[in-house]
Swiss-Prot record:
This is 4-hydroxy-tetrahydrodipicolinate synthase. Pathway: Amino-acid biosynthesis; L-lysine biosynthesis via DAP pathway; (S)-tetrahydrodipicolinate from L-aspartate: step 3/4. GO terms for biological process: diaminopimelate biosynthetic process; lysine biosynthetic process via diaminopimelate. Belongs to the DapA family. The record marks 48, 111 as: Part of a proton relay during catalysis. One of its GO terms (cellular component) is cytosol. Its main location: cytoplasm. Pfam families: DHDPS. It catalyses: L-aspartate 4-semialdehyde + pyruvate = (2S,4S)-4-hydroxy-2,3,4,5-tetrahydrodipicolinate + H2O + H(+). The keyword Membrane does not apply. Its EC number is 4.3.3.7. It is found in: Cytoplasm. The active site is at residues 137, 166. It comes from Pelodictyon phaeoclathratiforme (strain DSM 5477 / BU-1).
């Protein structure tokens, strides 16, 4: 991979469940078709928004396979495949590739609180175990550790299949360093919907978005407008959907976005424990915003 090719709008796809808590495969296929119709560039099942900690390896395999089948070459499929045990993360990566993933999203090892060298070695083992491109997922608000820019850049330079980072932080200094120092093949994607506009203005490559579950066309348009330098249009889109982007995190992701999708008639509102439904107060706030935007 001598050139950068991960860019645009990616969706961190929810996992729909039936009332009996099995995966709703019919709803999953509908969600994928909704993304394809909107022109989403990358579809990512089995990540944080997909409730991956509650999915068995067999379920993850089946979800990735269904998404890959439904996409039918119209987008890239990047599977969430990470955990805090390096051997297990390698096994998840191999499982995702076997299921048909075109690339992998691998979360930084959480809870263990590894050193930067430990993080480097974790990703080294994954990169040496598979040949598909890997997206480092840096989300210190969930993992309890930040993958430093120096570590990300070291990995990108040492392994050609370390292809991108999902930088789910508001650390603009780190983002700036990554954008300025990265090798040619390496993409930098934001994981913060609220930062799409400033991130793209800094030279970012795109977003891995939660809101794209609800408004994939609009997120795609926002990214494209910012990429092309049409800041007036980008600001218009950002202004219109700013409140929704904020409400998606009024409680733990993916609870708000799954509630919104249920109100939009796309999935049933079911979560696997320890996630529970939204409070009545927050449901009302989301209902009001969805109505205001004409989404329900």
């Amino acid at each position: 991979m001598s050139t950068r090719y991960l860019s645009g709008s990616a969706v961190a796809l929810v996992t729909p469940f039936k009332k009996d808590m099995t995966v709703d495969t019919d709803a999953l296929r509908r969600l994928v078709q909704f993304q394809i119709a909107a022109g989403t560039d990358i579809i990512i099942p089995c990540g944080t928004t997909g409730e991956s900690p509650t999915l068995s390896e067999d379920e993850q395999f089946d979800i990735i396979r269904i998404v890959k089948d439904e996409v039918d070459g119209k987008a890239l499929v990047a599977a969430g495949a990470g955990t805090n045990s390096t051997p297990h993360a390698v096994a998840l990566a191999k499982n995702a590739v076997k299921a048909g993933a075109s690339l992998l999203l691998s979360v930084a090892p959480y809870y263990n609180k590894p050193s930067q060298e430990g993080i480097y070695q974790h990703y080294r083992h994954i990169a040496e175990a598979v040949t598909v491109p890997i997206i480092i997922y840096n989300v210190p608000g969930r993992t309890g550790c930040n993958v430093a820019a120096s570590t990300i850049l070291r990995l990108a330079r040492d392994f050609e299949n370390i292809a991108a980072v999902k930088e789910a932080t508001e650390n603009m200094s780190q983002i700036s360093e990554l954008l300025e120092e990265r090798p040619d093949h390496f993409s930098v994607l934001t994981g913060e919907d609220s930062l799409i506009l400033p991130f793209m203005a800094m030279g970012g490559d795109g977003v891995i978005s939660v809101a794209a579950n609800q408004i994939p066309s609009q997120i795609k348009q926002l990214v494209e407008a910012a990429r092309l330098g049409d800041l007036e249009e980008a600001r218009r889109i950002n202004r219109r959907y700013r409140k929704l982007l904020k409400l998606n995190f009024i409680e733990s992701n993916p609870v708000p976005v799954k509630y919104a999708l249920s109100r939009m008639g796309m999935i049933e509102e079911n979560y696997r424990l320890p996630l529970v439904p939204l409070s009545a107060e927050n449901k009302l706030l989301i209902d009001q915003e969805l109505e205001s935007l004409g989404l329900i």
